[in-house]
């Protein structure tokens, strides 16, 4: 996807001055720093790319707030088309980790922590493997794989399939392994986990708490794996900081819109939006946006 180029200047609240080298200016690179020798918050992407990412963050959060799921299914294909999958996944991870922290106390209180721990044991193997794929696979191959996985997961969600029966440790760990692999590679681990626990016979409050607590733990695994793999740098951090308010606004707006449509209607709308995002994110369509 070719987006309009132009300078983007990021000035952090504590920044004392803006440092722009001539070489960086020629490349459209801008860096904000609190001191001449301190670490830089750098954005090398064009202004159009960053605006597109912020829009994708709002759009994804709007759907999540509206339907309770789907943020990664929308954000990852779109953001990957703009800046690449190696940047898109860490950005969503950082934003989501920060904005869901407030949900943890209640989740810890009501979750079945033994089951969550069992699933996390599978994720501790799956997440690093997925992160390794994200770090080493060619970007174009990753984008095709992400779009294909999103469409497959969408078909899975539309089918309405649920695991029926009490969760068993070997199944729980296996789902954690698969979800961890998807999360490490593209932050797409939600559908397998939700499908498994939603049909497991637990109360809705417990299921929701299990999911929140599990993803808090798997997010830590992803963060460590991404950090060790060199996938979280100053540019990712800078864009995540910019995207966080848009994501928060989207969540609030989506929650507000929830009462204005029937369950069938809003699920249909969300499924359509996910499909559009997956198709729009395909490398085959990059030339259409140039």
Predicted regions: what is each one?
Residues 43, 132-140, 226-237, 286-290:
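Membrane-interface helix termini and inter-helical loops of multi-pass transporters
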Residues 49-118, 176, 180-183, 190-251:
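Small-residue-rich hydrophobic segments that form or flank transmembrane alpha-helices
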Residues 84, 138, 262-266:
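A helix-boundary/kink motif common to multi-pass secondary transporters
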Residues 100-108, 131, 136, 145-170, ...:
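Transmembrane helix exit motif
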Residues 114-122, 145-147, 167-176, 208-212, ...:
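Cytoplasmic-side transmembrane-helix entry/capping segments in multi-pass membrane proteins
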Residues 254-274:
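Interfacial loop-to-transmembrane junctions
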């Amino acid at each position: 996807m070719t987006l309009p180029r132009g300078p983007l200047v990021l000035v952090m609240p504590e920044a004392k001055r803006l440092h722009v080298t001539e070489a960086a200016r020629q490349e459209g690179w801008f860096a904000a720093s609190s001191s001449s020798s301190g670490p830089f918050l750098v954005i090398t992407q064009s202004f159009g790319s960053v605006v597109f990412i912020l829009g994708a963050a709002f759009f994804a959060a709007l759907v999540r707030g509206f339907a309770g799921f789907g943020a990664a299914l929308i954000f990852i294909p779109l953001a990957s088309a703009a800046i690449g999958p190696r940047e898109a996944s860490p950005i969503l991870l950082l934003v989501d980790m920060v904005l869901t922290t407030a949900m943890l106390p209640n989740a810890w209180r009501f979750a079945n922590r033994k089951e969550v721990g069992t699933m996390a044991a599978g994720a501790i193997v799956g997440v690093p493997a997925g992160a390794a794929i994200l770090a080493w696979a060619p970007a174009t191959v990753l984008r095709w794989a992400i779009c294909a996985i999103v469409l497959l997961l969408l078909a899975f969600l539309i089918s309405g399939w649920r695991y029926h029966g009490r969760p068993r440790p070997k199944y729980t760990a296996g789902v954690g392994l698969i979800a961890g692999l998807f999360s490490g590679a593209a932050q797409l681990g939600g559908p397998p986990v939700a499908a498994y626990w939603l049909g497991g016979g637990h109360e809705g409050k417990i299921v929701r708490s299990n999911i929140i607590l599990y993803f808090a733990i798997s997010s830590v695994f992803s963060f460590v794996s991404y950090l060790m793999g060199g996938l979280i740098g100053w540019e990712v951090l800078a864009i995540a900081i910019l995207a966080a308010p848009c994501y928060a606004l989207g969540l609030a707006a989506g929650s507000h819109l929830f009462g204005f449509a029937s369950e069938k209607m809003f699920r249909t709308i969300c499924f359509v939006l996910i499909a559009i995002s997956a198709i729009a994110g395909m490398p085959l369509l990059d030339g259409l946006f140039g």
